[in-house]
Amino acid sequence: MQKYFVLLLALLLSACNMSRPIPELESVPVTDTPGAEGGYTQCAWTWASQPLPDLTAKVQSALEAAGLKSVAISAEAYGENCITGTGEVDHFAAMETDFRFTVQVASLNDHAALGKMLEQILVILDNFPTGSTPGPNAGYIGVTFQSGIEELRLWFHIADGESAREQGFHGTELLEKLQNQ
């Protein structure tokens, strides 16, 4: 029985090594190796941000038109710089737009007023949706409420702000919901 097993194994192994026809050189497609002249740049990617002064001015104008004169805005694109082999930045690839607001308030203890102000800011940002700003992804919103030297800082994803309002959060509840993100 052992002889038959060895014979069968030898037969199978020899069948696996049967010669195959060699493909003709003409049947293998020739492809060009991409080079720098083709528009491709080899990059070392590094995280980076770039200010968006035009978008900042548009959002600031919308805030002022809504009567929110105590609010300052800074919009920036977040993404990656393409660093060439010589160490120079070839280009920037935006992934998202982040918005940072600074709000001067009388008191940080009036959560209803802070929540109302936050909701007004989010309503204005609805006019600047993802797709109309640099980058394919929804970014983040940072809000810093300042009263004298005291601050209350919020940092949340744009989608979380939209979701909280869709769930019916307003005023104090909206502030608390987004403060815990």
Identify the role of each PLM range.
Residues L25-W47:
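Post-signal peptide N-terminal segment of mature Sec-exported envelope proteins
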